[in-house]
Amino acid sequence: TRLDSPTADQSIGIFTDDVYVGRSGLFNFDLYDIGRVEVVRGPQGVLLGRNVAGGAISIYSARPESTYGGSLNASYGNYNEKLVKGHFTGPISDSVNGRFAFQVRNRDGFARDIAHDIDLDNVDSVQMRGQLQYLPSNSDFSALLIADFTKDSSNGFHSVALDGPAAGAG
């Protein structure tokens, strides 16, 4: 559901790395470097600690690994779309693993605002995530630190309200 009220909870909860995303408008970013997605139906107040009557979607980023690895992908598409994404992972010390993932996406808009001479609904975003995982030897304890950064300079779409007799003409 789409709910813009600042005082109401949405009926389906969205969680990213066990952090509740309170409004669907806050979830306006691309998914990248995903490890798994879990979907749970029905009320989940006890399991997830939130009043989500319709269920929950939990999205987990890929975790740091104890072996070195990585990937790098680049693509080009219509409307001059450029997408570069990748990740690097591996051990930093005997008890600490790290992971860095990123995505850069740029695309021209689908429409043109002729009054202001700009593209509309363009995409210009940068996303980065860094993780440190502490796994001490001879212990069941573990800790995971995740830092996310998103910069979205996209201009979205433009709408103009019409008034008068022509407003309902179709």
Q: Predicted regions span which residues?
A:
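Outer-membrane beta-barrel domain signature, strongest for Gram-negative TonB-dependent receptors
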Residues: 117, 122-170
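Short loop/turn motifs enriched for small/polar and acidic residues
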Residues: 1, 105, 146-150
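Extracytoplasmic beta-strand/coil segments of soluble accessory domains associated
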Residues: 1-19
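Outer-membrane beta-barrel translocator/receptor signature
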Residues: 10-11, 23, 32-35, 41, ...
